[in-house]
Regions:
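Bacterial Sec-dependent N-terminal signal peptides
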Residues: 1-24
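Extracytoplasmic
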Residues: 41-44, 79-81, 119-123, 135-137
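A short, solvent-exposed beta-edge/loop patch
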Residues: 127-159
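A recognition module on extended beta-rich or small alphabeta surfaces enriched in W/G with H and D/E
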Residues: 159-168
């Protein structure tokens, strides 16, 4: 399911350009605070890649097959990526899961909702800050409370580069 959510986030980024004028942005500080508060709790798994980690990830992608057109386009999309945070808390006890969900909802309150997907009662919400003038979306958060999954992509992403990948 986590792979699906990551793929969904990257797939749906082009649709952010259709969002209304920005009502608010995702607060990196609030998101980091929630992740920091719960990262050492039982049943909570956190992966945090900062600037250096994402640079290494880009290097691995570049090294894997630089002659491949898809790889080059993925690198173009990733050039604005500054950090990735993933928190999975689906295996935590129910009361902790409810607290984490509540804190994440509070941290995302007022942020621009780019998209909400409902599937068999499960919701996946994608937040971010879109700028129609520059054709970019910044600081994207993917939140699936029923699955206990939260993904935060820090950086600025060009919608045109993402659209090229999606057209294939």
């Amino acid at each position: 399911m986590k792979k699906f959510l990551i793929l969904l986030a990257v797939t749906l980024l082009p649709l952010a350009g259709f969002a209304q004028a920005s009502s608010g942005k995702v607060s990196k500080r609030k998101v980091a605070s929630v992740i920091s508060q719960y990262k050492n709790k039982a049943g909570v798994d956190v992966v945090d890649l900062g600037w250096l980690g994402t640079s290494l990830l880009k290097g691995l992608v570049r090294y894997s097959d630089a002659d491949d057109e898809d790889t080059r386009q993925a690198l173009m999309m990733m050039k604005g990526l500054k950090g990735i945070s993933l928190m999975s808390y689906d295996e935590s006890d129910p009361s902790l899961k409810a607290r984490i969900t509540s804190h994440l909802e509070k941290a995302l309150k007022g942020a621009e909702l780019l998209m909400e997907v409902k599937d068999e009662g499960d919701k996946v919400r994608i937040y971010g800050t879109s700028d129609e003038k520059s054709g970019k979306v910044r600081d994207v958060a993917v939140f699936a409370p029923s699955d206990g999954t939260f993904i935060f992509l820090s950086g600025s992403f060009n919608l045109e580069d993402i659209s090229k990948i999606m057209d294939k």
